[in-house]
Design a protein with these regions (language model features):
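N-terminal helix initiation/capping motif
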Residues: 1-32, 47, 94-106
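Short conserved beta-strand and strand-loop elements enriched in small hydrophobics
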Residues: 14-18, 49-61
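Short beta-strand-centered aromatic/proline hotspots
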Residues: 27-28, 64-71
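A residue-level detector for short acidic-glycine micro-motifs
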Residues: 31, 70-74, 84
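A short, polar/proline- and glycine-enriched secondary-structure boundary/capping micro-motif
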Residues: 38, 50-51, 64, 89-95
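Short, solvent-exposed secondary-structure boundary/capping segments
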Residues: 38-41, 76-84, 92
Length: 106
């Protein structure tokens, strides 16, 4: 079904350092899942191009470096799919999801 996501997304706010070809730029995260994320940037990224993202879901998390595939860009919002997210980084994302869920119950 079109529009159905492979996994649930949840909000995340962190700074992202990006490299796409010759471009190096900053972005602000918007939401994330175990399969990808979206972020806001002024950079123009072609759909189906690859980029490298560096970010920390929380200040106490290790730096995550992941190769991504650009799936969409509408205005300043870019959607990407993770291509090589390591298992331990997926665990940090699951903990982030649990923090978001716990914060929503208060």
């Amino acid at each position: 079904m079109p529009g159905v996501r492979a996994s649930e997304r949840w909000p995340i706010r962190c700074e992202i350092h990006c490299q796409a070809g010759d471009q190096v730029f900053q972005a602000e995260s918007f939401d994330i899942s175990e399969n990808g994320m979206s972020f806001l940037t002024d950079a123009q990224l072609p759909v189906n191009s690859e980029a490298i993202l560096h970010y920390r879901p929380h200040a106490d998390d290790p730096l995550i470096v992941v190769r991504v595939l650009v799936r969409s860009q509408v205005g300043k919002r870019v959607g990407v799919q993770f291509l090589d997210l390591k298992h331990e980084h997926r665990e940090h994302l699951r903990r982030h999801k649990a923090r978001v869920a716990a914060a929503g119950k208060t």
